[in-house]
Amino acid sequence: MALTLYPAIDLKDGACVRLRRGEMDQATVYAEDPAAQARTFEAAGFTALHVVDLNGAFAGRPVNGEAVRAILTAVAMPVQLGGGIRDMAGIAAWIELGISRVILGSAAVKNPALVREAAAAFPGRIIVGIDARDGMVATEGWAETSSLPATEMAMRLQDAGIAAIIHTDIARDGMLQGLNLDATEALAAAIAIPVIASGGVAGIEDIRNLRAAAARTPNLAGTIIGRALYDGRIDPQAALAEAAAC
């Protein structure tokens, strides 16, 4: 089965940025107009978009709503959104506005009942982001690290009814060091839920390696690509062709 590639738009103060290891003071601005960037990704052939409200992740509430709404207006492809979404009202509001899938991160750790409630209310629309630092789950925009192993959290979510898990290796995020495929594949092998790899994609080889891993672990469903696209290290057409190869 083909992998899904999700170009990433991370929003900080209304602009499209990339961070290094989630550090807000290590932000590089790549586009002042996130909606235009979303259109560029869609025109390149991508079929889904990953958007994170970085300010929202730290504030615990949506902050870049205007930019998200502009993205939704600009593109027809499905958009998944995370960052600062912490309750049913927020989830429902974004889905009503046209968000395809809502990503719960800190809320999933601190309020597991919310995940089950949301997944029951919005089947196929809820994703959980498991962000790991040295194998342990991090929350609050990665500012806090828990004592909960990422794989254990994934196993707890096995029967929650969610659509997918995004597994991010914080140490590699934005660093162009390659996916931590060992950790991601181990997590995926422990569950049946589709798993999306994130953090560190540096080149076409990462997609090739992920495809090989998916042959062994079929619920590896795709990957999120950020800095490598913005820096021109990955050609979109080549990446999409590699992801679709059997």
UniProtKB/Swiss-Prot annotation:
Enzyme active site: 10, 131
Record keywords, A-Z: Amino-acid biosynthesis, Cytoplasm, Histidine biosynthesis, Isomerase
Keyword Membrane among record annotations: no
Record's GO cellular component terms: cytoplasm
Catalytic activity field: 1-(5-phospho-beta-D-ribosyl)-5-[(5-phospho-beta-D-ribosylamino)methylideneamino]imidazole-4-carboxamide = 5-[(5-phospho-1-deoxy-D-ribulos-1-ylimino)methylamino]-1-(5-phospho-beta-D-ribosyl)imidazole-4-carboxamide
Pathway involvement of the protein, from the record: Amino-acid biosynthesis; L-histidine biosynthesis; L-histidine from 5-phospho-alpha-D-ribose 1-diphosphate: step 4/9
Enzyme Commission numbers on file: 5.3.1.16
Localisation: Cytoplasm
HAMAP family registered for this protein in UniProt: HisA
Family under the similarity heading: Belongs to the HisA/HisF family.
Name used for this protein in its record: 1-(5-phosphoribosyl)-5-[(5-phosphoribosylamino)methylideneamino] imidazole-4-carboxamide isomerase
Source organism of the structure: Acidiphilium cryptum (strain JF-5)
